[in-house]
Amino acid sequence: YLENPYENMSATFSLLSSISKHLECYVVAGFPERASDQTLREFGPTDIRHDARHKEEETISNAHLPRIPRKAYNSAMLVGPCGSLIKVFRKHFLYEVDTTWADEGPGFEYIELPRIGRLCVAICMDLNPYTLDTSFNKYELTSFCDRNQIDILVMPMNWLLPEEDIREVNKDLAQPSVPTINYW
């Protein structure tokens, strides 16, 4: 179910608002976003957004990317200590399965939080090179964070467990996936 984060009725917002007020802290969580007029207004020019996508000729292939806008995003919302929506971040680099329902977000962003500093929220695949076809040496997200002196990087994600790890993990759920750790 796609949610509009600007309607205080969304399930994710209601949960985060309750948690943030109870704990008096900032809370971030991912959710599937239905684009609203407010969403599209936020896509105007800004000095804190960075479109890290590469020109087509720099990638081997971008065939898995959507050809038509879907008006939906793989997003994460930041809710403040008073329970109010502070910002919505949208996944910039889509994983293949995301392209079946979501559009690419407009770019990496950050927000200044009082007494905390610059916070960047990126989602899962944003950590990888764009479309997995460009060089792993480009480090788009970390370059953005370094260039903008980001203090905190928050990354909600749902890592896929390598098939060879499934039996091992089921034996001892407290043990990490070594191939995943080695990948990063």
Language-model-detected regions and their locations in the chain:
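Catalytic-core segment of enzymes that process non-peptidic bonds
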Residues: 2-122
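Short, solvent-exposed loop/turn segments at secondary-structure junctions
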Residues: 34-35, 93-94, 126-129, 159-161
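A Trp-anchored, charged/polar loop motif used as the substrate-binding/catalytic surface
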Residues: 101-109, 121-123, 132-146
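CN hydrolase (nitrilase-like) catalytic-core segments centered on the catalytic cysteine
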Residues: 7-29, 128-184
